[in-house]
Amino acid sequence: MKLSELYSKEIINIDTGENLGIFGDCDLIIDEKTGEIISFISGNTHFSFFKESKGKEILWKNIKKIGSDMIIIEND
């Protein structure tokens, strides 16, 4: 699967049922030495004049299933 195919998928936490946003709005954390994806930050991570919005960091290994329209994650 190409990374671009993940952009429109919703991220759902299977433990809580929480919708964590769209993968295309996430920032990836990549290991500079190996090039592996370590984690991604879901939700709004933009900077506003008054406050910085913080997303939730999700480890790449916590992805349990990538379906046709969503990504299922599980808490560690």
Map each language-model feature to its residues:
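Peripheral interaction segments used for macromolecular assembly
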Residues: 1-76
